Amino acid sequence: MRKGKVIVISMMFFCILIFIAAIVWFMMYQGELTEPTSEEKYAAILHASGLLKSDEHDKKTIKNLYQRYILARKVNLDSGEWVADDVQTQGCKKLAPEHDPAKIHQRCTIADVYLVKDKSNKIQQIILPVFGEVAKSVMYAFLPLDPDGRTVENLYYYQQRETPFLGARVEDESWRKQWPGKKVVDNNLMPALRITQEKPENIDEYTVDGISGATLTSNGVERSINYW
């Protein structure tokens, strides 16, 4: 019996060491992330849309899929109107803290939006770039919405530096699978998404169960999505 307890304690100690080693590795190498290349960004958009199912695709395949099914547009965030593709990103302004829930520090008037077409060129999704500062880093994601502009079809984080096994679980399929069908705005088109850590009895269409042990990351995800 005593031998069994020793084995259990040894295994627990070993797991703790592995966890600490992972955290140390993360802290040492988190600064090495660089701005994603065009191919990486294209791949992330295709993953978010569901057109790309795995990472085992060459650059040519990614480029062909992107050119065939993705239509990049620019939108004026102040007016909500489409603008010409050759309009440069202008009019960036600093944000006061009380008007900067996503902690992005400045916002540009012109932003990119990606439309996903089917084979008959009918729009199937509207993909919004979402980013904001959370617990450990600025996280970048693509948020595909139904053409109604309210209903989530997926949430795909493609660059983040959150703590392994905690905030970094924003990329886990087990957490992401609850997003399809959620609403990001209410019937009055006001931001309404909630991410809760309290595991409510009834999770409605506006509520997502947060990541256990990663309250700051969960709150940051909520703020950044509601901002954009």
Go through each PLM region and give its residues.
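Flexible, solvent-exposed loop/hinge segments and secondary-structure transition points
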Residues: 2-228
